[in-house]
């Protein structure tokens, strides 16, 4: 029996506003002593009243616009009632039937993943479980942090697409500069709702999974406790296989919440899954409904920066990067800015040399992408300063996308990197010398031309000087010369290597090969 996989995502993202959602407490609780960024409002003292954070509302509208959503003209906050120690009020201020944004989509691999809603709520506190103790502690510093929840339609059919969607959403949040969206710090939390249904026994209509005929739908399972994109994909894959195996073994599935165990690579049951009725939603009586005018929406739209997908497309059209190169270089806000600054500086360098930038732009962009993706990041990885994600660039190659803010910690400026690319492009240094210079630039910064001069790495391409050196190489390697003349042409590389060694690696390989062929073919 064959099954279809049905996946919907719920993604929570903390907004990095200066103050919390409904009070004036500092919203940055990272590294703070427990329960020090709290006040009577976020601790739910009797008689206190919440005041909504305008910036959090505007940023939620901005997310909605970035994800092609409709914005509700009338929105409101609701009370979500449940008891848990990390919830000081005994309820959470959230949104139920009138979210700020709804009915949107985000393209993944050129296919739209539909978005049901994007709503705004307050975060809870954090439970701490001391090792070896029989009690738990609670830190309310996080309570009241603005939290945006995105809910997709159940239209995702595989774990890889779910992971790509979450990664793309993280990119957008960072490009908009409204959330750090760091999963390791809990600033971005992904939950997956998963069910498996027999093929041709169900249909998707108006946002609902419905049975065909007398078929009884299998229940969905919610996955929690997932702290990385890698584990999101693994957890979904495992859970799909678990459910299919259970059904084939004649077991009955239940609607439940399951956690993910990174160490064991399995999901485990936590509790039976609640329904919306269990939360007894009702309108928040202390906060009036939100009226969102078109004028307000238009003002917010004016502040929306270029998004990753748009920047990727522009990089391909403007600089002739390949789709994979553009995806990598435009995939991080700081890296994209660095790349554009380098291309701008290259325009100045090439124009100053008397050449035409437009004529050389394609080749310069290729060199820039190669040295950024395949060389600079390789050096940084070796120094332990990178490695967030690995993308294939060409067959057999990989580019490493650095973590956010990487270029704040690297001493290379766009101006110096553009000068470095110019030296390579104009054959003033060979590949070996370029690697040495780049390593020095990463370590100490500085002008690549000065580094080249200090280390004596300028490429030797003087015809007369090289002919003299190559003549000596030929004289000392008569056996290889005879092999070459007998038709064993790959020996030429040996002779090139001998010449490079004789010049301390400074010779221009192209000129060396040309001279060798001229002398050997006489």
Task: Walk through the language-model features, giving the residues of each.
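C-terminal non-catalytic interaction appendages of large macromolecular assemblies
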Residues: 140-145, 157, 183-190, 199-203, ...
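Extended, non-catalytic structural segments that build the interaction scaffolds
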Residues: 297-303, 310, 342, 417-429
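Strongly charged, low-complexity linkers/loops
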Residues: 387-392, 407-418, 428-501
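Structured, non-catalytic alpha/beta "coupling" segments that mediate domain-domain communication
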Residues: 113-116, 122-125, 266-290, 365-383, ...
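Basic, nucleic-acid-interacting segments
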Residues: 1-306, 317, 323, 344-364, ...
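Amphipathic alpha-helical core segments of compact helical bundles
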Residues: 16, 197, 241, 336, ...
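Core structural elements
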Residues: 186-199, 317-343, 363-383, 411-417, ...
